[in-house]
Amino acid sequence: MTNHTRNNKQSKHNKTQKIRILPNLTSGQRQEICKTYSNVFNTFEDKMKPVDITLNKEINNLFKIPFTPSKITPNNDFYSYINYRWIKDAKLNENQEYITQLDSFRLVQYKVYRELLEIVKEYTRNNDTKKSREIGNFYKSQLKGSSLSQVKQYANETLNMIDDLRKDNKNLWKLLGVMNRNEIISWGLPFNFNVFPDNKNPKIYRCYIDPGKLTLIDINLYYDDGTDLAYKSNYKRQFFKYLNNLFEFVFGKNHGFNVKDIYDVEVELNQLFECVGRINDPNYYNIVTTKIAMEEYGFDWAQLSEYIGFEKTPDFFISGDLNYLDCCTQLLKKNWDTEKWRTYWIYNYIRQLVRQNQDGYRIYFEFNGKFVTGQTAAVYDDLGPVFGLGYAFNSFLTNEYISRYENKQYVDYLKTMAEDLKTVFTRIVSRNKWLQPKTKEYALLKFKHFKLIIGSPKTLRE
């Protein structure tokens, strides 16, 4: 009984204390206490200064102050209009004059090029292994370049190989295979071989056969349709001048080649993109087996893969355009060994070869750099080796660069942002009411398995 009485008294005492601490307050008083109470986040309300709404007129006037010359408007040059002040302050040094489009990406790219070359110099200086010697020899070779006599020797050896193969029409696949071994020239061949991750299963590498790239970046130049006559005439005149200088540099003034054959061949190749009759996969993913390639297209995948260097023919390759595959095969089988195509084959080789010689590179630059892209200066001489090193030692350079310069904070930030975006889009699709159930199901499945690689993949192909 005594304990019960004591508890009741204590309870009454507590209630009395509460009443003393928190008397009846008005709504405004409670808010004031809550604002200043030590365990509550500070609000920004009390820090806001009253703003005279008449200042709106002054603010509007500030926005009207021009920050670009009057001739630059969002309508005629949006890029310069937005970035005028940055462009005005950003200056290229002498070694960066090859850059034609001034932006932060290209300036950072230049910085990365320099850092890669420093990695090469440091690695070869501090290591004495087979790889370090290979990298060192390659770097010195690229820096020194090839002499004119070496250029002529390599060009004539390749031309002799082409002529030997032309003696038998069946050697088409051998020629394509041998030339596709070299990535520096293979991109311009009628059939360009590559090994890429499978578009439908990135963990597996597949063989891809795709059209090569034509020389002229404006495909309208391959059409004689009566339009832009002055522009096309001038462009082709510059192109033929470049081709003639190229062949004279390598084979002498009396080289005997008709350089206009190169343009004519590329006109034929461009027309192949208009071929029809085959049904293509909408995602440019057409699996072509060795048997189908030979029986339906006349494309000898077995021979081509053998001369590329495969000991065993891959069961299939992937083509982005079956119509091109069909029509180009027929064109090559009919014409590849003609004089016109002889000029084209050797052109694919020597246009890259001359870039290894200082004087030859100037010929290449005058057309491809100065005329086509508007470069005011060639790539600085000591920067040149970085491009060849990128082909020969790509995995090594990537791994070394990441080990030295990776910023984990940036990587983590981008990963988090990407995951947040993935979550947002997943929710949007989940709430969608108009998609077909099956389509919605597959879309969500893709989001679930979607992976974004930032920096570099865990493993790189050597």
Where in the sequence are the language-model features?
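Compositionally biased low-complexity segments enriched in polar/charged residues
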Residues: 1-35
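Noncatalytic, helix-rich "gating/capping" subdomain that lines the substrate-entry/channel surface
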Residues: 111-421, 457
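Active-site-surrounding "flap" and adjacent substrate/cofactor-binding loops of secreted or lumenal enzymes
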Residues: 52-58, 72-76, 81-149
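Hydrophobic/aromatic-rich, well-ordered segments within soluble, folded domains that form packed cores
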Residues: 67-88, 227-247
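Short, Gly/Pro- and small/polar-rich lid/capping loops
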Residues: 33-66
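Long, K/E/R/D-enriched contiguous segments that form extended
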Residues: 399-462
